[in-house]
């Protein structure tokens, strides 16, 4: 019998992506870790919270986190 190796989930991506109840992939915004003083208040406010992964990236990310 041939032993099949299980595919592992991408551990770095598992920490950055959450899955909603409707199976949407939620991610945080970029450009908010430092140098926030040079950004406007509106920019910093809009970078808070999470957003959904775009459809063009969805299938690629879904294959990387197959275990979740």
Curated annotation (Swiss-Prot):
Pfam families: Ribosomal_L35p. One of its GO terms (molecular function) is structural constituent of ribosome. Keywords: Ribonucleoprotein, Ribosomal protein. InterPro entries: Ribosomal_bL35 (IPR001706), Ribosomal_bL35-like (IPR021137), Ribosomal_bL35_CS (IPR018265), Ribosomal_bL35_sf (IPR037229). One of its GO terms (cellular component) is ribonucleoprotein complex. One of its GO terms (biological process) is translation. NCBIfam families: rpmI_bact. Belongs to the bacterial ribosomal protein bL35 family. This is Large ribosomal subunit protein bL35. The lineage of its organism: Bacteria, Bacillati, Mycoplasmatota, Mollicutes, Acholeplasmatales. The gene is rpmI.
């Amino acid at each position: 019998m041939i032993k099949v190796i299980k595919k592992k989930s991408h551990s770095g991506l598992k920490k950055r992506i959450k899955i909603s109840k409707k199976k949407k992939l939620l991610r945080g915004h970029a450009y908010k870790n430092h140098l926030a003083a040079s950004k406007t208040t509106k920019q910093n406010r809009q970078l808070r919270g999470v957003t959904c992964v775009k459809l063009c990236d969805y299938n690629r990310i879904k294959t990387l986190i197959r275990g979740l």
